[in-house]
């Protein structure tokens, strides 16, 4: 079999191995979806990822306005109607702080981080109520100080609200259309009155995976601490953070002009509605948030998916090694033997995924790679007609697996490490074949086959 034809055959075998590799990659995606479903199930049973917004001071009012309406006869008439609306005021300063106590919930094979945030939300308001408008017959309603949370099932115990040092009763709902949360009713102010208050809410809020805050104050200070050692900060980066094996502490200092949260909140509120219906600011809009995700630094499915991206490289390198043995040592290797070794390399990724669901990823990687190296080394001892050659090939394969593990755990340096690995492999092939006369070798192989 001529060298050129054998090279084409090796390339075809490599392409065929891509089929089972793609099947393994699809399996990884399927297992990820199962994991996501488990996370959603725990969120439904426990509490969803939480986003906290507020407090927001809402002062409703009604007034008489002149509206232009077209009658059935096509004539435009001016009609005077009562119209409901509201003024919305944000804190001049908002402080949210507390500790995030974490735990792990299990759903089948999957573990999901959950938490309970024991926190305090302090806010200062200093607003001016608009004065009367001549002829409007304006009537100011009961002001509402509202706090929003994504999932009220996460509220543990009874939250306590103090306004100007006095405890105030909390009611269900955030005080605006369908918003989940809590609110307090305040005394009705006079038109043109100066309205100032200091509020402090103490609560315990449970959730899964992440907690975030909407910076609605003119000045916002958010401080979080936890024993979770692997936080992933979302939104704007904290201006100060400390992360160690024992946990993290982070603080954000953000002005409203840096987030545009106030404008986005107002843009989604119902305006000048007489029915009280309209979009929910808490549910229908994605407001800017600051917070933390309780991340898993070693996501087995993500690492396995990245590993399969290198699968074709592994197969190609192994087949190149086979080819070198075949042409240099004059050892005929059948295409079926190429295929069996290629399938063994694919089985490594399948073992990696399945084992990592039960044991830590490093242990799963060591077990899967060790099993495949042992199997391939044992098989090649017969194929290459030497136990030493089989052991040497297995040792080389072990170095490749070690290099792959380094690529997986060092994502930031994956490109440079991968480039160096490819350079080293190419250099090894060039050095090993630097004195080969490929024309003469091809003729020798052809004559040997003929004889």
Could you tell me what each predicted segment is?
Residues 1-26:
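Hydrophobic alpha-helical transmembrane signal-anchor segments
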Residues 4-9, 106-113, 184-191, 303-313:
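Membrane-entry segments of alpha-helical transmembrane domains in multi-pass membrane proteins
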Residues 21-25, 297-307, 406, 410:
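Glycine- and acidic
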Residues 24-49:
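Alpha-helical transmembrane signal-anchor/signal-peptide segments
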Residues 37, 44-45, 58, 70-288:
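Soluble non-transmembrane domains of integral membrane proteins
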Residues 43-68:
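Short extracytoplasmic
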Residues 281-315, 334:
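Cytosolic-side membrane-insertion boundary helix
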Residues 312-451:
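Generic detector of multi-pass transmembrane helix bundles and their immediately adjacent loops
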